[in-house]
Amino acid sequence: MMALDASRPEQIGTLPDSNTAIVVLEGLSMYLTGSQVRGLLQALDKKYQELHILMDVYTEFGVKASKYKNPVNEVGVSKLYGIDDIESITDGLRVRYVKEHSFTPARLVKELTPADRLFFKLLFTGKLYRKIYRLYELIGIVGGNK
């Protein structure tokens, strides 16, 4: 594992060479502007022939709501960024949106106790949850659609 500064996409060049990369960008995008996220995706896109990305994002509304209760407030972060439209970030890149995933798939929610099931359904599924937070799958393949 290597520590890199995501706001400096040129550091992607120091990652090991390979044809394929699987990248998990968790808890990262809210610290980067849209153009910085795009720069990071573009650098990954240039480095690898085949790229699979799982990326979580706060929406712009989610960022505003998180000002009141968010662990990042305790570490001195003063500016957060949200993404409402991932395709506006990937437009023109080989990296493209595949689908949106849920952290709480219905099949797993069904395994919870009735009280927990109700709690999860209210807070972590549906329109309210999607208004705050999203989990995206992205892919980039040489010869794929641009």
Write out the residue ranges for each language-model feature.
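Alpha-helical subdomain
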Residues: 1-146
